[in-house]
Every structure is written in C-alpha cells, then in structure tokens.
Amino acid sequence: MRTNYCGLIDVQYLDQTVILYGWVHRRRDHGGVIFVDLRDREGLVQVVCDPDNPTAFQVAEKIRNEFVVRITGRVRHRPPGTVNPNLISGEIEVLVSSIDILNASLTPPFLMDDESLSEATRLEHRYLDLRRPQMQENLRLRYKVAMAVRLFLDQHGFIDVETPMLTKSTPEGARDYLVPSRVNTGHFFALPQSPQLFKQLLMVSGFDRYYQITKCFRDEDLRADRQPEFTQIDIETSFLNESQIMQMMERMICTVFKSVRNIDLPTPFPRLTHGEAMSKYGSDKPDMRVSLVLTELTDVMQEVEFKVFREAALRTGGRVAALRVPGGGALSRKEIDDYTGFVAIYGAKGLAYIKVNALEKGMDGLQSPILKFLPENVIQIVLERTGAKDGDLIFFGADKAQVVNEALGALRAKVGHDRGLAESGWKPLWVVDFPMFERDEEENRWKALHHPFTSPAEGHEDLLETDPEKALSKAYDMVLNGSEIGGGSVRIHRQEVQSKVFRALNIGADEANEKFGFLLEALQYGAPPHGGIAFGLDRIVAMMAGAESIREVIAFPKTQRAQCLLTHAPSTVGEKQLRELHIKLRHA
C-alpha cells in the first residue's frame, strides 16, 4: 500500500522507507546511475536507481516516459548542489530498493511539460493532457471552489436538492437540446438550460433555501467563455428581498475567494444601475479595473455637417458617444486601423477620432479627418465633456445605441489593457435595475431581458401593460473584472403578475397554459416571495486560475464547434436506434 504521495515527501521523512506509485515523468542516465522523476497528482520526486542493486537497476533500464511503476526506497538528502528549491521534495531523493513496472506506455504524442501544444492535440489526447501539472492544479482548484461553496451554503441553511435532467422544452433564450422519447412517440424531453422553474417550485414546496451545483445545457454559438454543457451554482431562497440576497451572495463569493486563493475582494461591492453601466461603460458587465469612460454626445451632434454623426443623433434609438484615451495621441495609424477593425466585429462601420496635440493652439492643435465637418463650438464641447488633455486621443461611435455601446464598450476594455490604463487585482460590482424587456427587432415584439419569471421593480407592475419599455426589474448581476459571474433576480410569486408578464411578451393564455401551466397553478397555492441567483462555476474557476478559456478548467470540454475531439461526439447512430425513436433523417 502506498505510504506517501511523490510531491509531498520532504526532509521530515529522511531515512524512512516509502512506497510510491506514479508515472515516469523523465528518466536520465548519469554516471552509471539511473535517475527517475516520478510523478503523481501531488508533484514530482527524484528517484535514484543504483547499479549496486542489480535487480532494481535492470528493471529501471527498461522503463520509459509515462510507464506506471511502484517504487520502494529510502529517503535521503540530495547531494550538495543538486537541491531544487522549486519542489517540496527538492531537498531529498529516494534511493530505490525495489521497482515494479505496473504498466508500460506507448511513446506519448507530447511531453507533459510541453507548453507549445495546440489545443486540438491536447483535447484529442485529453487523458494525457490532464496528467500535466497545470491541468491537475486547475481541476483541484475547481474542486476546492465547489467545496467552499457547499460549506458556506450548508452553514447558512441551504440544502442540496437535485432537479430533473429530462424536462420540458420552454423558451429561455437559447435553443434547447432535445431528447426524443421512445415510449411517447413524437414527444421530446429537453435538457435543462437551468433549473429555474424547478427551484421556484421548491420554494412553493416550502424548502426555503435550496442550492445545487448542476449541469446546464444550451445549444448556442460558442465563445471562449461558453460550452454547450456547463456547470451552474444554482441558488434560491424564500422571504429575502433583492438587497438581502445580494448581501448574502457577496459574502459567499468573498468567503470562497479568501478560503481558496487567499484573495480579499474589496467590500462592499459597488452597485451600478444598468442605465449607468451602459451610458458610462457601454456594457452591462464593465471591467472596473479600466478607468476609461464613455462621454455622451448625442445632444450636440444633431445639427452638425458630418452626416454619420447627425443621422445617428437624430434617429430613434441612436447614439453618439466618445471615448477619451489618455496618451492615445501616440497611437500610430496602423494601431488606429487595427482598432477600427476590432470595433467592426461589433457592427461599427468605422472609428472616427481626434488627436489632441496642443489645446493652447485651438483648432490648429487638433488632428483629425473629421475636423472640417464639425463646428468649432461643438468640438469645444467635446473637449470639455471628455476632459481632453494634450497627448490624448478621442474615439467616436455613432450608430444605433446598441452598436455604439457594444463597440465602444469592447474598445474601452481593449484599449485600457493595451495601453496600461487598467489596474491590477479584482474589481467586483453589482449591476442592478435592469429593464424588464428588450425589443426583438426581427420579430417586432418584446422579449424578457433576463427571463420571464423576473419580478418587476416596486411601482413598475402597471408599466407591464401601459409602457413595457420603461418597466424595470428586480434583477441583479454580479460582475468581476468585466465578466458576469452570477445573475439573479427576485421572482414573480403572484399568478396575476406572471400572467401580465406573459401578455407583455405576447404569450397568449393558451400558450402560457400549455408551456407554463404547472407554474401558474403552483403560484396559486400560497407561493412565498422568493428569489435567487446562479453562478457560473466554470467561469469563476477560470478567472481564479488565470485561464484564457473555461476549457482549461473543465475535465472533458467541447470545442467551439460543440465537438468532443476525444470521443468524437456527436456521432451518427444506427438505423435500429433511429427506428426505435421513430426518427427518420432527412438529408439536405
């Protein structure tokens, strides 16, 4: 039986006999002696095979990288000059008395410490990739975060309740993954996008405080921070208002960061309304490490000669805004062109700018292709509002407000980090007072900004029917360093209010009853006031790990094409299986 993990042996075990199991990380022959770096999940230890022990030495001559071995030996000091201060085991080595090969290995397609691997290679051989120390550390970190969450919630009276994985397809924003029913011909289950409705029903059932760390599924286009299946820390509670829920969740996140990473998040988290966030930062998840802000200019551009600005300022739902970049006057033409290409990703048709060379020279101290289209008094207002100084550069966005916000909001974050205008550390905040609805221009109707079960703000219930555009909600998002790590709301607990929301969303009574009849009925049986939040576990762990993608903290992730390169899922299935499910494929 193993006595120790390789990476945890240190000088306290000197002269003790240990039994180790692990993988051969590297084998070296030096001066007639064989050295083996033996690796397990805790790290490395140096093992020495001396020719004075011919039986063990003969076995050691056969081993290669990634062989699985059992080693018995005595712990001793490393010779002077060979200490490795980067390892816990760096002061000692194990002199082998016996060695057994438990399994051989093919030559691996890459070394475990190779940092230049393509992601495709890593995902194709994920079982080998996961042997690498960084991946071991990432998954250990994930475990610690989940345990810290469970401990906090247990201490605060929450109970873990599992909800169904096979459920009903309901409109929640993204496409569902559908599962055909064999026994109910023509009917389909859906994999849950979240446990939203079930956790609300648990509140109706009187469980008071619920949580679950669970898989959720969304069939949507993938980005670095998205997966078709992801893990959610799902939380719901009764009889707490939004402020009380936010305070408790703030304590939970602070506790998790402190216990897992010894990070003290600054408290209390500032609160920013959705309107302020979009106006000043162009984003509902602003990175507060970046000091740059947007400046509103719509009101002063309505009569200017420059057509792009004037038309955006006059159109309904249009916006003209500026972003001042301190020291940005040093940007080259190529750098500006690169930023122009960057904002094009977000729908911007161009990126006008003014370089501020010398304010004391008036118009002669400015440099821009658009100066001739703007009157001097308007330019003066721009300089005053943005607080421009010599050496600055001012970028402009003019289009539909959504395009301007997305383009300048993303540019703000990128320029801030590119130009050293971002602080280090952690900057959390709450974004609150979200609109209830947003306009779906393609379908010409309102859709829920979060989900249709979010409660309207106090005094906004009547607006659901009279002026939906102005209705605010009791929704709140927790944002950290520009990433939304959690989102929640107080829910609707009265059936008549839920019906009003459905009507505002153009969901008729028959459709509402077909899709949500069970919820509407449950709300009539003494549903308590309740609310909750859901955190993205993958995203939180990735941020703690400093990973560029959540794929780095998921054991077996999918690619951005929603494929598993290891198992080659999704795959075709046999005709017999399709017949059993009453499915016939139509080939395009």
UniProtKB/Swiss-Prot annotation:
Which annotated residues bind ATP? 218-220, 227, 484, 536-539
EC class of the enzyme, as a word:
ligase
| Binding-site residues, L-aspartate | 172, 218, 450, 491
Top-level division of the source organism's lineage: Bacteria
EC number, as in UniProt: 6.1.1.23
GO MF terms held by the record: aspartate-tRNA ligase activity; aspartate-tRNA(Asn) ligase activity; ATP binding; nucleic acid binding
InterPro entries, alphabetically?
Aa-tRNA-synt_II (IPR004364), aa-tRNA-synth_II (IPR006195), aa-tRNA-synth_II/BPL/LPL (IPR045864), Asp-tRNA-ligase_1 (IPR004524), Asp-tRNA-ligase_1_N (IPR047089), Asp/Asn-tRNA-synth_IIb (IPR002312), AspRS_core (IPR047090), GAD-like_sf (IPR004115)
Record's subunit section: Homodimer.
By sequence similarity, the record places it as follows:
Belongs to the class-II aminoacyl-tRNA synthetase family. Type 1 subfamily.
Q: What does this protein do?
A: Aspartyl-tRNA synthetase with relaxed tRNA specificity since it is able to aspartylate not only its cognate tRNA(Asp) but also tRNA(Asn). Reaction proceeds in two steps: L-aspartate is first activated by ATP to form Asp-AMP and then transferred to the acceptor end of tRNA(Asp/Asn).
Know the name of this protein?
A: Aspartate--tRNA(Asp/Asn) ligase
